[in-house]
Swiss-Prot record:
Identification of the protein by name: ATP-dependent RNA helicase DDX42
Keyword Transmembrane helix: no
Compositional bias of kind Low complexity: 35-52
Statement: the UniProt record of this protein carries the keyword Glycosyltransferase: no
Organism: Pongo abelii
Cellular compartments per GO CC: cytoplasm; nucleus; U2-type prespliceosome
Enzyme class: hydrolase
Quaternary state and interactors: Transient component of the SF3B subcomplex of the 17S U2 SnRNP complex. Interacts (via the C-terminus) with TP53BP2; the interaction is not inhibitied by TP53BP2 ubiquitination and is independent of p53/TP53.
GO molecular function annotation: ATP binding; ATP hydrolysis activity; RNA binding; RNA helicase activity
Locus of motif DEAD box: 407-410
Matching SMART domains: DEXDc (SM00487), HELICc (SM00490)
Lineage of source species: Eukaryota, Metazoa, Chordata, Craniata, Vertebrata
Amino acid sequence: MNWNKGGPGTKRGFGFGGFAISAGKKEEPKLPQQSHSAFGATSSSSGFGKSAPPQLPSFYKIGSKRANFDEENAYFEDEEEDSSNVDLPYIPAENSPTRQQFHSKPIDSDSDDDPLEAFMAEVEDQAARDMKRLEEKDKERKNVKGIRDDIEEEDDQETYFRYMAENPTAGVVQEEEEDNLEYDSDGNPIAPTKKIIDPLPPIDHSEIDYPPFEKNFYNEHEEITNLTPQQLIDLRHKLNLRVSGAAPPRPGSSFAHFGFDEQLMHQIRKSEYTQPTPIQCQGVPVALSGRDMIGIAKTGSGKTAAFIWPMLIHIMDQKELEPGDGPIAVIVCPTRELCQQIHAEGKRFGKAYNLRSVAVYGGGSMWEQAKALQEGAEIVVCTPGRLIDHVKKKATNLQRVSYLVFDEADRMFDMGFEYQVRSIASHVRPDRQTLLFSATFRKKIEKLARDILIDPIRVVQGDIGEANEDVTQIVEILHSGPSKWNWLTRRLVEFTSSGSVLLFVTKKANAEELANNLKQEGHNLGLLHGDMDQSERNKVISDFKKKDIPVLVATDVAARGLDIPSIKTVINYDVARDIDTHTHRIGRTGRAGEKGVAYTLLTPKDSNFAGDLVRNLEGANQHVSKELLDLAMQNAWFRKSRFKGGKGKKLNIGGGGLGYRERPGLGSENMDRGNNNVMSNYEAYKPSTGAMGDRLTAMKAAFQSQYKSHFVAASLSNQKAGSSAAGASGWTSAGSLNSVPTNSAQQGHNSPDSPITSATKGIPGFGNIGNISGAPVTYPSAGAQGVNNTASGNNSREGTGGSNGKRERYTENRGSSRHSHGETGNRHSDSPRHGDGGRHGDGYRHPESSSRHTDGHRHGENRHGGSAGRHGENRGANDGRNGESRKEACNRESKMEPKMEPKMEPKVDSNKMDKVDSKTDKTADGFAVPEPPKRKKSRWDS
């Protein structure tokens, strides 16, 4: 709004009547458009001249800036002033009625409620209320009198529970994530992927100053000292103990012989021990003597107490623990459950001396275990990996350890703990005492274990790996998996009526499936395998021990060490992966002399395991069913090993090939005799192309002729001879040394075509390949006859014309393979058998023997002169072809027809009688065998 003084065309005043636009040359800067600019426009300076600026009213500056006449800043000033035209929000006055409503709404009406601000407001309100409540409680406590602080205040347990409720993740570090397979021993054939725990680093013991300690606490009782060596042997035999090692201590037979003090004896009596078990009788004296030990005994035999009692004596002899000291005794075991069980035993007996025990195993709280170790404990029962973790984290150390035990040691070496076990042993002082215990100990594992021992004493109670005879084993052969399920559901209620039932399954997935199926059938049961949380495993075992659940389905994680007396039945629903695991499985019942039953369910595909199971049953004096034996015989390795030394006996399987592989317990003697109709002389056995050229063909022919000759018809007397020589002449298994004929064959001497003749016209050099069963041990008068007969006739059929010198050399070296058989005599490795035949031909035993040995040999041996062999007896000629048969016939006659001996004596030359002792001895098999002549020693004498 401009003030105009008036002039030509312009009214005086503010110019409400019209507007004027200045038309002068010099334009005045435009004023910012404001609300009052509509009242008038700037006019030209018509009255004051061109250069005079217009005069503004005095109230012009109200609500506006001073005009900026600087052209350079005009542009920016316009923008700044344009932004000031924004309308300001409405702000009600203090006493306005709308102010309260204004405050109840957020300033920014477009945004919603912020949840974080609402939550924080609630937290603040809650905190305020809690503080107010606490203040009120404090006031009440001050006002009320007669309050006992020891009751009202929180004790340690309440404080701990409150703290854990407020801090559920307390003590859990990031490294302690769930790793359920760390110590899993469920027995899967494929080793599960485990958390790799690096072993402890090597340590230089020479830099550490270890204090000395005493290991030997055994004072032998006078009753034991007074035992004679024979009585000591009888005592160990009675306890079924086998002890090896340097100077083992004598076993005790009662607790009085151990020399325990009254405190420990009170605890032992409280545990209802009446007398020590066999492994304790020998193991406790060995451990008290400070010796390293390998203890092997069947399951449930008291191995745990055998190393815990000496451990307490060992600990009590040393000074008390100081702050920062590690344990004195460390017991290492493979599974968590076994660790907890040994820990419970250690606490029970350690109460006698107020000794502390700590269980350290995977799955437990690392923080709690570390705290218990730092507080100090004389005994630590642990699994290998967790102990290594604690040593690495400085929760404990092994400097004071002087008593180290590995329970179920073979399992730890077998499960892949070997490096960890060795690193633990290497971190303990070198002069420690180390004990290894297990129920099974294979030779390979024992060699590995001996590296950490020094001059150990090996104590074996019973047989290594033998099953407990208190457990009755029953094997069920079923057709398939569904058959096993039907069998189980049909019998399970019956089993639970007699006691708790433990079901073993090989794989974890199968265990869960079986448990779920049984639950659907309405059975109350528990499940235990390596993938479960440790708390769940503990709860299941606790409920099973308390008989809250009658059935437990488990993998092999429960196969070792669990001592639950209520288990009366063990069922191997799946077979174990090896016989050692099977032994431990069935050992969960029949504990401490109690009786139990173990069922093993087999299917046709389990033939490999059936062979091991047969031997396990036989070793425990259990019944082996025919079905189980037939299943085991389907396995080739068992069938072959069964032939060599087993109890089985197979039917005669004839036909081509090397028959001895198919005949268990039969036919070592008859293998030495082929049929001379097939091969008439040694020329047929020349190896033409190689070491096994025609030799293999000859062997096959010999065996074929052997079977053909079994059933040749003949007269009554000849049948006797034939049956005795060819059918029942002491067949033994290939590789054995017990080749003793069982029947007389003399009746067939006078029959040229008798079965004994056809059966014995064989080739003595090819019987029982690979063994020495055909060679006699003590046979008489070969030397005597050889000496006397070398001077007689040169009527050998093959006409090799062996000289007397050759004959004498053969006689003296009949035990070697030097005798002359014409062209082929030196080709035959079994030539000692021809010499043995001569040894067996005692003149005083046979009326025809002197003539039989004159020209009986068609092999060109030339050791017997004359042709009386052919005229006297065809049997003698045949025996000449096969010295082994002649030997056998003489041996049979010595047993079956002793009445012939006096008749034979007159026909024996006086020179022979000078060199032959007519006395005969009985062998261990009950067969009469004459004493050997006085002659030079041969290799058979040894």
